[in-house]
Every structure is written in structure tokens, then in C-alpha cells.
Amino acid sequence: YLVRTSDESTDKIEGSVIWYSWTNHEILALLVKRVEQFFGNAKTTGELIKLSQPSLAQFLDQVMESVFSGHGNWARIPTYRMLMSLVRKRPRDLVKLCTLAARNARTTNDAIISTKNFNSIFEEYSQGRLQDTVNEYRSELPDIERLLLGMKPSREEKRAKLGYVYTTES
């Protein structure tokens, strides 16, 4: 959403708000369309949406490694899966993630974006998304930053990997 719909100043525009949500598939197709346009290839959104995600990912091979060589659950997974797991169904998250990684690749003179480039920018990306969340919900939850930082796993939980397991059980 471009504006917070529950903000105290939105009563003047709430009748004009256009509700739109993205799927990760649409966001991946959007990235592929941008890459294809950069290389002078005209693909329509309709054409791209019809393709499977692995098929879409092949278009990205000219700008980033196809396999992300991370650790744990991210060990040798398709790069597009790593990207989709981080973007919260928000196109601007994907733009930010890819822009940071591309700048890192340029700085290190890499021909394409690699696992190393993504790993180098994850902390900056995460801090930015945390700040986005704080800014987005501050008017509704004034203490949102303390709440979010309080959810951070402890050192012991990190070592045991318990801090990253969330269930719906009470």
C-alpha cells in the first residue's frame, strides 16, 4: 500500500485508496520483465505470468547465479527461491535487495550477482526492512521497535537454532 489506511490523516483520501496485493509469482515475473527490458527483449507481463517460477528464473541467469550457495535451509537452493523468501510479497523489497546486491557486485567487479554479493548486503537489507516496519506501524503501535527487537533470538537460541522456529501452537 502506498499509504497507511489507519493513519489519522487518511480520512480525506480513504475513498480513493486502491487495494492491490502482489503474489510472489507476479513479483518474480516483474523482475524478469525488468531484466529482459534491460537487454532489449520485449516480453509482456501476460507471457511471463504464464511461465513457471523455474522457467522465469532462467531469464535471471544472465544477471545472477542460478544457485544460491548458502547454509542450512539455504544450502544450494535456486537463487529465486531465496529472493522470494525475503520479499514479503512487496515488489520494492525485491528491488531493494537486488539493487544492494548489484551495487556490491559492481564494487567487487563481479560480472553477475553471486551468493557472496547477497551475503554481503543481508545485514543492511534486514536493517532497512526492520526500519520500514517500525515506520509503517509506529502510529498504531508506538512501541513497535521495542516489540520487534524483543523478538530477536538470544545467543543460546541462535546456537541451538531454536530462535528461528515459530509455531502456531500456544
Give the label of every model feature segment.
Residues 1-72, 115:
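The catalytic "switch" region of P-loop NTPases
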Residues 74-80, 84-169:
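Winged-helix-like regulatory helical subdomains adjacent to P-loop NTPase cores
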